Design a protein with these regions (language model features):
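Short alpha-helical segments that sit at the start of domains
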Residues: 1-31
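Alpha-helix N-cap/helix-initiation sites
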Residues: 14-19, 33-37, 51-55
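Short, locally clustered residues in the helix-turn-helix/winged-helix DNA-binding domain
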Residues: 27-31, 45, 70
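Short acidic/glycine-enriched loop/turn segments that link adjacent beta-strands
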Residues: 80-85
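Short, amphipathic alpha-helical interaction segments positioned at domain boundaries
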Residues: 87-113
Length: 113
């Protein structure tokens, strides 16, 4: 997992805490199955009153993991007018496997002579 996180977030020492949060995200979602946005942010140690830009930090951790489909999100609407909702994140290793297989197959077919 460490090498995958290095590919996603880079080797910079400035991103070390982001890589740690990403690893913790994967472990938490693997153990619990799914977590709501606020619950996950709190578990990662992102305090909304302490960080200068907490949402930016949260999505900087989450978006690369969503891009490779290792985690996915789902909106659960809390009212009938569908204006209020909760975002729930969950771990999906099967989607990740499919995504990586497709990427590697495309790469292999392009470099194959």
């Amino acid at each position: 997992m460490k090498e995958l996180l290095l590919w996603l977030y880079g080797k910079s020492a400035r991103n070390a805490h982001i890589r740690d949060m990403a690893e913790k995200t994967v472990v938490l979602l693997k153990e619990k199955g799914s977590m709501e946005y606020q619950e996950l942010a709190q578990a990662l140690g992102i305090q909304f009153n302490q960080y200068k830009k907490p949402k930016r930090t949260f999505y900087f951790v989450i978006n690369p993991l969503k891009k490779i489909q290792l985690i996915q999100d789902k909106r659960i609407f809390t009212d009938k007018s569908k204006k209020k909702y909760k975002t729930v994140y969950f771990f999906n290793p099967d989607a990740f496997y499919g995504y990586m297989k497709r990427v590697l197959d495309e790469f292999h077919s392009e470099i194959k002579v």
